[in-house]
Design a protein with these regions (language model features):
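Residue-identity detector for glutamine
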Residues: 10, 33-35, 71, 103, ...
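Hot-dog-fold acyl-thioester-processing enzymes
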Residues: 1-52, 117-123, 127-196
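HotDog/MaoC-like acyl-thioester-processing domains
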Residues: 51-141, 207-211, 218-245
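Catalytic-pocket segment enriched in acidic/His residues
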Residues: 166-241
Length: 245
């Protein structure tokens, strides 16, 4: 990830990025199990078009000497409901990472009616918005970053890889942009505003971060994101895309 400053990232920036990736690892491991469950129980392409709405990670205690990364053996518990043209999917799974165990809940959504209007990102509410120039740090997110995350995590949902697919799934994403992974935004949030030890982590994806694939007009080939250094909330422009609880 690039910061708003010219030149290569500083060592502390790289260290923070590694910390954010490590903190979101339980959610990534859980998502892999959910993806495998979907492939087993649904059509092969059922992963494409799913929208990530929320991720909740709760720490649990495990016995000493647990393996470094061990996925829970029970598999995900999946609940599916329909509401107003959307399929809502809630999954819960336990994963073990390092010496800790986490119960991870992912909330996903899929549009089932093409006639529905696109979802709109929730604007920052009066009194809770922050000034991007004074209340947070600026970061650049490129399509290369999104593609690298897809390769590393195995989440190759078409909305993150192919232009127009996010809009078809129900997001207000431009024709030359993709939607960044929710957990990639979560890693960025946790890198900038690390939680206290063993604190539950609640990531709410209330809008899409649109990342351009091709240059549009005079704009650069990156998304400009502002991360609040205190809360970890992320905004693109004045539009909030991630809120931490």
């Amino acid at each position: 990830l690039g910061t708003g400053s010219p030149g290569p990232p500083q060592p502390e920036t790289r260290h923070a990025a590694l910390r954010g990736a490590a903190l979101v690892l339980p959610a990534v491991m859980a998502m892999r199990q959910v993806q495998e469950w979907m492939r087993t129980h649904d059509e092969p392409a059922s992963w494409d078009g799913l929208l990530h709405r929320r991720c909740l990670m709760r720490p649990c205690s495990v016995r000493a000497g647990a393996s470094k990364v061990l996925q829970g053996t029970g598999g995900p518990v999946v609940r599916r409901t329909g509401r107003a043209g959307w399929e809502l999917i809630r999954t819960t799974v336990e994963v073990r990472v390092g010496g800790g165990s986490w119960q991870v809940t992912h909330e996903l959504a899929r549009r089932t009616s093409a006639d529905l209007p696109a979802m709109t990102g929730k604007l920052t509410e009066p009194g809770t918005a922050f000034d991007p120039m004074t209340g947070g740090a600026l970061y650049r997110l490129t399509y290369g970053d999104v593609a690298a995350w897809a390769e590393a995590t195995g989440d190759r949902n078409a909305i993150h890889i192919l232009p127009r697919r996010a809009a078809a799934a129900g997001l207000r994403t431009g024709p030359d942009a993709v939607a960044a992974h929710g957990l990639l935004l979560g890693a960025l949030s946790l890198a900038v505003a690390a939680p206290s030890s063993q604190q539950q982590i609640d990531l709410r994806f209330i809008g899409s971060a649109d990342v351009p694939v091709a240059r549009c007009g005079g704009g650069g080939l990156w998304a400009r994101l502002c991360v609040d250094a205190a809360s970890g909330d992320i905004a693109q422009g004045r539009r909030l895309v991630l809120r931490r609880r």
